[in-house]
Swiss-Prot record:
Summary of the function given for this chain in its UniProt record: Component of the acetyl coenzyme A carboxylase (ACC) complex. First, biotin carboxylase catalyzes the carboxylation of biotin on its carrier protein (BCCP) and then the CO(2) group is transferred by the carboxyltransferase to acetyl-CoA to form malonyl-CoA.
Biological processes per GO annotation: fatty acid biosynthetic process; malonyl-CoA biosynthetic process
Chief location: cytoplasm
Residue intervals of the CoA carboxyltransferase C-terminal domain: 1-236
Pfam families per the UniProt record, alphabetical: ACCA
Compartments, record wording: Cytoplasm
Underlying gene: accA
NCBIfam families, per the entry: accA, AccA_sub, PRK05724.1, PRK12319.1
Listed name of the protein: Acetyl-coenzyme A carboxylase carboxyl transferase subunit alpha
Entry GO CC: acetyl-CoA carboxylase complex
Quaternary structure and partners: Acetyl-CoA carboxylase is a heterohexamer composed of biotin carboxyl carrier protein (AccB), biotin carboxylase (AccC) and two subunits each of ACCase subunit alpha (AccA) and ACCase subunit beta (AccD).
Enzyme class at the top of the EC tree: transferase
Length: 256
């Protein structure tokens, strides 16, 4: 098995810790909030409020299931527009009350179904990109599995973007890339090599700011590592002025 094949499989592994696992383990007294106040609740996006060392934080994540029944509830981690609108509602609420935002990203992409398109999938993603770029609070985004296309970026316009070591981040799946370029989806891992989708490759290109190592760590050790990184980073970002937060976020993404 090649290194890229192993990383892609690890990123997609159904046994990986989910957004909800991290939210409950890292943040004290995590309380979920539901619904976009327009259509319905989307099980693919979780969000709520928790406490990190006494600091209130808004936590949002894209949630995959751990078995078939759970995956059906979570739509296999592919959000509908109401999921992105729920996320935006919680982010605007965080801004209103001065809470920093932490997002956990794990999706192959936004759901491409007819109903999702009819309800404005593209608009929901675009609005999140626009609104996140101007939020007046610190934002940290962590890719914990797959970071697929605009569906991931809709929660990823942050002051700091981190990746777990065995996660991937790309404009589309390796299978999609291979199908478009070579009309042969079986060449997916060859495509993945060309796409430069791994954490260390993206760190080298300055697409992400930090790689959180996983090798040799238990789940609890990984949770502890992320919690410590968040404590340090939020302490630093919280000392910035609103103008510094917004300008740094803008410049971070403009440089691409």
């Amino acid at each position: 098995m090649t290194k890229i094949t192993r990383i892609v499989r690890e990123a997609r592994d159904q046994t990986r810790l989910t957004a909800l696992d991290f939210a409950k383990a890292i943040f004290d007294d995590f309380i979920q909030l539901h619904g976009d106040r327009s259509f319905r609740d989307d099980g693919a996006v979780i969000g709520g409020i928790g406490s990190l060392d006494g600091r209130p934080v808004t936590v949002i994540g894209i949630q995959k299931g751990k078995n078939l029944q759970d995956n059906l509830k979570r739509n296999f981690g592919q959000p509908h527009p109401e999921g992105y609108r729920k996320a935006l509602r919680l982010m605007k609420q965080a801004e209103k009350f001065g809470r920093p935002i932490v997002t956990f990203i794990n999706t192959a992409g936004a759901y491409p179904g007819v109903g999702a398109e009819e309800r404005g999938q593209g608009e929901a993603i675009a609005r999140n990109l626009m609104e996140m770029s101007d939020l007046k609070v610190p934002i940290i985004a962590i890719i914990i599995g797959e970071g697929g296309s605009g569906g991931a970026l809709a929660l990823g316009v942050a002051n700091r973007v981190w990746m777990l070591e065995n996660s991937i981040y790309a404009v589309l799946s390796p299978e999609g890339f291979a199908s478009i370029l070579w009309k042969d989806g079986s060449r997916a891992m060859e495509a993945a090599e060309l796409m430069k989708i791994t954490s260390h490759e993206l760190l080298q290109m300055e697409i992400v700011d930090k790689v959180i190592e996983e090798t040799g760590l238990s789940n609890q050790d990984l949770i502890t590592s992320i919690k410590q990184e968040l404590l340090v980073e939020l302490e630093q970002l919280s000392s910035w002025s609103v103008e510094e937060l917004v300008d740094q976020r803008y410049q971070r993404f403009r440089k691409y």
